[in-house]
């Protein structure tokens, strides 16, 4: 893993390492408890979580409507795409697709300040934490997204648990180091 994330570009070794999930599955298999890695798809049924458990604002997704989740923050600074550049990504998305609904995921003082500003400037954006009461509701909403754009962060892994495709943006870490979300497509990594 250290060879893959080494800051010295000449010493980097680009080799896919097993994911954490694969490592755990191997341990359980050696203990006599094999795990079928294809068995788990989502914590919810194929149609997603029960939208009736969400505030009314989130209950009415039209069949042809696109819902995009954006989770631009992470616990570690090196994993965060620069805020102003992410704002430009969202602004471009809103300009090119004014009919899309954009849901901003994150909790904390910086997230609140940032997302309150973004929602004032871009009415298609909704700051999820202002309306959602708990993690279960966030997971239900995530299960109805068409895609989540996320850093290497908890939100990438949460979206993976509800079988939502994730476009993941990597900074200080690398998907080849085994950190990619469950069942996520390597082609969707940046």
What are these regions (language model features)?
Residues 1-190:
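Catalytic machinery of carbohydrate-active enzymes
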């Amino acid at each position: 893993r250290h060879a893959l994330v080494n800051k010295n570009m000449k010493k980097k070794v680009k080799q896919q390492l097993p994911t954490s999930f694969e490592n755990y599955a191997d341990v359980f298999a050696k203990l006599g408890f094999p795990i079928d890695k294809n068995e788990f798809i989502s914590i919810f049924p194929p149609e997603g979580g029960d939208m009736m458990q969400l505030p009314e604002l989130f209950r009415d997704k039209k069949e042809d409507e696109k819902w995009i989740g954006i989770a631009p923050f992470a616990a570690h600074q090196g994993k965060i795409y620069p805020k102003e550049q992410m704002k430009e990504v969202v602004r471009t998305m809103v300009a090119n697709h004014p009919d899309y609904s954009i849901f901003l995921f994150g909790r904390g003082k910086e997230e609140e300040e940032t997302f309150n500003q973004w929602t004032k400037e871009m009415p298609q954006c909704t700051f999820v934490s202002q309306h959602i009461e708990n993690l279960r509701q966030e997971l239900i909403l995530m299960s109805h997204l068409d895609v989540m754009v996320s850093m290497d962060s908890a939100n990438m892994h949460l979206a993976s648990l509800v079988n939502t495709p994730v476009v993941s943006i990597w900074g200080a870490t690398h998907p080849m180091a085994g950190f990619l979300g469950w069942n996520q497509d390597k082609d969707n990594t940046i």
